[in-house]
């Protein structure tokens, strides 16, 4: 359904953000 695909897209987006923070935490700035 429309809402399901929207939720999947949002979930993937959150995973990317989480990964970005994880990478930032591992590397000294």
From Swiss-Prot:
Segments for region (Disordered): 1-29
Coarse class of the protein's main subcellular location: cytoplasm
GO terms of molecular function: actin binding; ATP binding; calmodulin binding
Compartment(s): Cytoplasm, Myofibril
Annotated Gene Ontology cellular component terms: myofibril; myosin complex; myosin filament
Keywords carried by this UniProt record: Actin-binding, ATP-binding, Calmodulin-binding, Cytoplasm, Motor protein, Muscle protein, Myosin, Nucleotide-binding, Thick filament
Ranges of Basic and acidic residues composition bias in the record: 1-16
Role description: Muscle contraction.
Quaternary structure annotation from Swiss-Prot or TrEMBL: Muscle myosin is a hexameric protein that consists of 2 heavy chain subunits (MHC), 2 alkali light chain subunits (MLC) and 2 regulatory light chain subunits (MLC-2).
Annotated domain remarks: Limited proteolysis of myosin heavy chain produces 1 light meromyosin (LMM) and 1 heavy meromyosin (HMM). HMM can be further cleaved into 2 globular subfragments (S1) and 1 rod-shaped subfragment (S2).
Name this polypeptide is given: Myosin heavy chain, muscle
Annotated source species: Bombyx mori (Silk moth)
Taxonomic lineage of the native organism: Eukaryota, Metazoa, Ecdysozoa, Arthropoda, Hexapoda
